[in-house]
From Swiss-Prot:
Coiled coil: none annotated. Specifically methylates the pseudouridine at position 1915 (m3Psi1915) in 23S rRNA. Its EC number is 2.1.1.177. It is found in: Cytoplasm. It holds the Pfam family SPOUT_MTase. GO terms for molecular function: rRNA (pseudouridine-N3-)-methyltransferase activity. This is Ribosomal RNA large subunit methyltransferase H. Keywords: Cytoplasm, Methyltransferase, rRNA processing, S-adenosyl-L-methionine, Transferase. Homodimer. The gene is rlmH. Belongs to the RNA methyltransferase RlmH family. It comes from Shewanella frigidimarina (strain NCIMB 400). GO terms for cellular component: cytoplasm. It comes from the Bacteria.
Length: 156
């Protein structure tokens, strides 16, 4: 199974890139984690946020590989513990499809992305900076993988 992380924003701070890549490289080949960056729309004091969200959403959905299971990262989503996320990963594997996880920009995801999602995952009730979410998602997925494979990374 391939995990596809589709995120808005292309010029991340170095610590975000290093943090994401640290977990990305730990995944085995049979569960590769791929990052696809979508250019963020230009935001200014008079920006049309609805139009920007719409365009970002179109680009995100165009990046989803055909037939993938889509998971949006969104506040109304389901909170998963590490064991519950590990269980979700097992279900995704048994489903036989690759998984695309969608991370929006500063204003979140477009309505089209939310509607296209098969599932919605809420990392926290806190508002998190969208660059940091990349690192948290990569680590959480790696930890869930380690639970499923009895790797010593996760300890209870």
């Amino acid at each position: 199974m391939k995990l596809q992380l589709i995120a808005v924003g292309t010029k991340m701070p170095d610590w975000v890139t290093r943090g994401f890549e640290e977990y990305q490289r730990r995944f085995p080949r049979d569960m590769a984690l791929e990052l696809i960056e979508i250019p963020a729309g230009k935001r200014g004091k008079n920006a049309d946020i609805a139009r920007i969200l719409h365009k970002e959403g179109e680009l995100m959905l165009a990046a989803v590989a055909k037939g993938n299971h889509i998971v949006s990262l969104d506040l109304p989503g389901k909170n998963w513990t590490t064991p519950e996320l590990a269980e979700q990963m097992t279900k995704w594997q048994l489903d036989g499809r690759d998984v695309s996880l969608l991370i929006g920009g500063p204003e979140g995801l477009s309505p089209a992305c939310k509607e296209a999602a098969n599932q919605s995952w809420c990392l926290s009730a806190l508002t998190l900076p969208h660059p940091l979410v990349r690192v948290i998602v990569a680590e959480s997925l790696y930890r869930a993988w380690s639970v499923n494979t009895n790797h010593p990374y996760h300890r209870e």
